[in-house]
């Protein structure tokens, strides 16, 4: 079965098409009369009742958008939910990664593929977020120097991007979590996942500040430091710097880790 699925999507992608959509991301495969058939997750398809609700709430939210670009983003996303066409999703993803104005942003769709052993099928997730402007000064220092980090990365030069495009990084507060992001999201996210979009248009990185703060506070007083840290001076250093350096580690991971390097095959 695995071989059949891989061959099914390989035929869709074709040879040498670097800008092929992420085939399989929003569908279920089943067999009918011995042939593989793809059932799309759309407003009028599989899971249509739930997707109708997603579309309905997106359209209600649209009137509260901060600018015309955000309204356009919602139009593109709604179109994708209605057509199920992954080229529509790519058009939405390109517009999303280029939209930086305003305090509010969102992630919405069948995006992450961690739950699929073949790395094809997306799980639905949603976040509504707003910027932490003070903490974002930290991440923007990193993103504004992304080219320097790329040029000095200790990897084979073939994997370095000659020109880093569109790498942005913000610290945000999650106002809403849904789908696989609920009840506990990842503390950092970098999207979109399509390599060709990242190469040509860039990526967005976020560190979810109110979640990392909550996790850090929940871990206080659990006895770990008293039991395992060697002395009071080290405990004092950890109390002073551990949380901020942990956040900085997430910033570096999302912005410079996911946002860097290129496929050698492009060379």
Stretch-by-stretch model annotation:
Residues 244-256:
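Short alpha-helix carrying the canonical HExxH Zn2+-binding catalytic motif
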Residues 255-266:
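Catalytic Zn2+-binding segment of zinc metalloproteases
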Residues 1-30, 34-238, 242, 246:
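Contiguous, non-catalytic segments that form substrate-binding/exosite surfaces or channel walls
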């Amino acid at each position: 079965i695995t071989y059949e699925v891989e061959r099914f999507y390989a035929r869709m992608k074709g040879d040498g098409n670097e800008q092929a959509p992420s085939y399989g991301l929003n569908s279920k495969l089943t067999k009918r009369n011995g042939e593989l058939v793809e059932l799309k997750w759309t407003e009028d398809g599989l899971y249509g009742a739930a997707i109708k609700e997603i579309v309905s709430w997106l359209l209600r939210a649209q009137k509260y958008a901060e600018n015309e670009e955000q309204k356009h983003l919602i139009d593109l996303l709604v179109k994708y939910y209605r057509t199920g066409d992954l080229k529509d999703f790519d058009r939405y993803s390109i517009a999303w990664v280029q939209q930086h104005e305003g305090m509010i942003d969102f992630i919405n769709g069948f995006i992450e593929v961690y739950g699929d052993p073949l790395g094809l099928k997306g799980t639905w997730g949603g976040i509504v977020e707003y910027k932490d402007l003070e903490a974002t000064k930290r991440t923007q220092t990193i993103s504004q120097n992304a080219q320097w980090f790329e040029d000095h990365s200790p990897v084979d030069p073939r994997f370095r991007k000659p020109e880093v495009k569109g790498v942005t990084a913000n610290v945000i507060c999650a106002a809403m979590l849904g789908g696989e992001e609920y009840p506990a999201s990842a503390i950092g996210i970098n999207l979109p996942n399509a390599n060709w979009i990242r190469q040509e248009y860039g990526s967005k990185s976020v560190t979810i500040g109110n979640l990392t703060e909550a996790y850090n506070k929940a871990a206080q007083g659990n006895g770990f430091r008293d039991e395992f840290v060697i002395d009071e001076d080290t405990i004092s250093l950890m109390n002073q710097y551990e949380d901020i350096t942990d956040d900085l580690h997430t910033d570096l991971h999302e912005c410079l880790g996911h946002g860097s390097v290129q496929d050698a095959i492009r060379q």
